[in-house]
UniProtKB/Swiss-Prot annotation:
Name of the molecule in the record: Large ribosomal subunit protein uL29
Entries under SUPFAM superfamilies matching the protein: Ribosomal protein L29 (L29p)
Record HAMAP family: Ribosomal_uL29 (MF_00374)
GO MF, one annotated term: structural constituent of ribosome
The gene coding this protein: rpmC
Species this chain originates from: Desulfatibacillum aliphaticivorans
Family statement drawn from the similarity comment of this UniProt entry: Belongs to the universal ribosomal protein uL29 family.
Keyword entries, A-Z: Ribonucleoprotein, Ribosomal protein
Pfam family, any one: Ribosomal_L29
GO cellular component: cytosolic large ribosomal subunit
UniProt xrefs under NCBIfam families: L29
Signal sequence region: none
GO biological process terms on file: translation
Length: 62
């Protein structure tokens, strides 16, 4: 998800997306630990997406 798309969302929607992405990251880490995750790059992409969402949420709240 691009930063421009995130900025068009409302603060509540961004928070919901953060929760969803955090849950997905937890599941991906669990799959990675058990050896079931084939695409490990997805874990890093999700981590960066959460960071991007949190950064833009702080910008919106100011």
């Amino acid at each position: 998800m691009k930063a421009k798309e995130i900025r068009e969302m409302g603060a509540d929607e961004i928070r919901r997306k953060i929760d969803d992405s955090t849950q997905e990251m937890f599941n991906l880490r669990f799959q990675h630990a058990t050896g079931q995750l084939e695409n490990t790059a997805r874990l890093n992409k999700t981590k960066k997406e959460v960071a991007r969402l949190k950064t833009i949420l702080k910008e919106v709240e100011q």
